[in-house]
Amino acid sequence: MNLVICHTHWDREWFAPSSITNEWLKELFERLLDLISRKEDYRYVLDGQTLILEDLLSLAPEFEEKVKGLVQSGNLLIGPLYAQIDFRLSPEPAIVKNIEFGKKDVKEYGGDASVAWMVDNFGFISQLPQLFKRYGIEGAFLWRGVKLEKPSIEFLWESKDGSYVKCIFLIGGYRNLYGLSRTRDLAKKRLKHEIEKLKIFSLSGLVPLLDGYDLDVEPEDPRDLLNEEIELSSAGKYLNEAFSKTEEVPKVNGELLSGKYACVFPGTLSTRVYLKRQAYVVGKMLRYVELLASFRNERIDELYRTYLKTLVHDNICGVGVDTIHRNMRAVYKKLFGALEKSFKEHLKKLATHLKSGLYAVSFSPFEYDHYHCDGERCYRLQSEGVGLFKVNEFDRARSDETLSFKNDYYEAFFNQDGSLNVNRIVTGVLQLERELGDCYSTDTEKMDFSCHISKMQVESVGQRHKIVLLERVIEAEGIHIETKETIIFDESPLVKWNMTVHSCGKDYLLSFVTKSFEGTSKVFAKMPFDVVERDRIDTDLLPHDAGEKLNSVLLAAREVGSIRKFPFQGFVALQGEKTLAVMAKGVHQYEVDEEGDIKIDLIRSVEWIAKNNVKGRTGDAGPLMYVPDARCEGVIDFELAICELNADVRSEEFFKWFSLFDDPPTLVSVNKQDDRGLESLKFFSGSLPWVCVENGELLVYNPYSKPIHGLKPSQMSTILVNVVFPNSGDDRADVEILGSLRFPQLAFKKITERELEQLKEKIEIVEEEIEQVEQTLKGLRKDSYEYHVNMHKLLSEKRTLLELTVSLALNRGKVPKRLMRKLNELRAKRRIYDYIVELLKEGAR
């Protein structure tokens, strides 16, 4: 029997904001209720996320009981995730909360979900199978990211600890039977054609047949057209049947980040970097506040849910219209304000147990005893893990105008171009390239540019620290960039490099380059719950012409040529005789070339969501919509560090210093009327990185190459943190935060009237092209293959026209509801035609 899964893929914010798409949800559910009332055995997969229901009920709470009834009867299949986040860009706690909240929601609605439905996420992290197992998720349906030498619909996906999940690879995409009711005469031919195309990739004999599409509000029952030839299924039922019919299936280990069969869009790692920077800071504050709140049995779930909505793949990847991303900035600012207030309130409560004085609030589990400089002050940090620790000693000022520094870990001196020699390497080199890509994909070429110093001077110096101010100007044709940089030296092995970049111009890539002169060292990158080893270049991709069998199923965009840009969260390291790491906060795209240059991509300036004919990508990626905010013209802050150690990248010694960079101490002043109290409050310590609070305990994992504290390498577990607060004589304390996480401020240029005129000119060109195709169609027989090819072209041109028209309205400050709905309908019609043309191509041969 042929199993068909009916579903929708709900891009709640992409070419239209959720304020618009939420209105469409009501329409979807009205139709679903009607369909199920007529066909009680109908099943519908709600995109594997419970956020859709949250959105629906926020607008139409009267649906709640009906929805619960559908879930409990098995007609509506929800979860197990809360939202379809981007796993490459989301921080560790958010990834955990996304599963936790999803499973909780499913339970509250009376459902059950043990198979993840992730049909359009832009790749997956290595430890997801282990996380899924922790939450009772046994399988997954995937499309993007899969890297199999020989494609197979059924495979096992394994984490480093040995945990695995059963997977269904949707090699033909998630919409191969979509819109049968709109192609009634071809319905049975489409079914037969899809089965014929896909069965060669199936080990079980079953092929995934999916009736659904993006923002589909018209659910259909394919049995009306295909009768007894098919049976409606669910993700769980399909998975069980497929694996019951197979004895041996291929196993894939680790990350799924390949664009071999479907794009994972590496360019999205650096699109609208200002969003990534703000998301990082808000994510850190959530983690800190949740920990402090847990000591008093308080939860911050609603704040986390608001945050998770910004991590949905189209949102955090920056591939939506400007309206959406401007709203994200407002959400981040509001979240940060609420968290900052809560953070201070929790510190005030903790401060009642302390004496008056200065304290370092530490969120790193490691112990430190060295002079630490935060860019304003240099003090002796004596911490014993996570807690509050008294600060008694500050560095003494001295006179020294030399642009060099030496400690137990390195010798450093500045060069005339503003770059810095640190032992054997050169860092702080700024590189500018011409960017030819779009919001989805990066394509760069060399360009002529100049970089000169406008200021370089010592700002502060002591016995144990030095702060150097550096200002540079970068210029190229149509581009002007000014930087204000603060380079911080202290007793640690970290050289901290903070930058404020003021940019004007477009279509460029600005990178922070560290020259290691190591052409053969191994490359490692910090990713959620793991340190992964990667090749410098990924060439395991298919050519433009993948051959007849693959061409017939790979109808969507995929990467071709080679991939040089990869994701990271925290650091990129080269390991040879020593470990050299470049660390960054809220910046996620890197490249390591054949000579050993580590490039951290800071700003990638583009102005279209998706363009045609971007090098390195084949197929249709997304809408041709003008998004001037993606040029990143304005002011953006960055925080980086360079560290070289005689230690393995997967060692406690290395993570001790990375943790200091990623979770630096916050200096606070405590003032009480009496002087009773402690000089420290220690919550916990150790060498295992902690993630978040999970069911009242602390989730930790072992990133090291050897067992530690009873955990095998790569294994996750929880530890109980028992914090007992002593009685204090004074229940009031004033707290002043002297140095904390700073919210990245942004200021962008407004669109000009000339740019709007250029957009109108593009619209006129497309209108002329539409007229030409319509004339061609008049001379063709409607039953000919050429007619359908040209009809496909006409639908593509009309879609482009609507995309540009919606862009024009949005850039004039309007939200064109009617046009957005029309665009959604035209996108669906055009997508159906992909399969019609491919089907008829077989007959034309």
Predicted regions and their residues:
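N-terminal catalytic cores of secreted or lumenal carbohydrate-active enzymes
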Residues: 1-93, 97, 106-107, 134-137
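Conserved short loop/turn motifs at secondary-structure junctions
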Residues: 48-54, 84-87, 113-124, 146, ...
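Terminal accessory/anchoring regions of large secretory-pathway or extracellular enzymes
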Residues: 33-36, 225-775, 807-809, 815-826, ...
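Alpha-helical scaffold elements lining the catalytic groove of polysaccharide deacetylases
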Residues: 86-105, 173-198
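CE4/NodB-like, metal-dependent polysaccharide N-deacetylase domain
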Residues: 95-134, 192-210
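Surface-exposed loop and adjacent secondary-structure segments within mature catalytic domains
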Residues: 67-68, 126-177
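Alpha-helical scaffolding within the catalytic cores
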Residues: 28-31, 58-70, 97-98, 148-161, ...
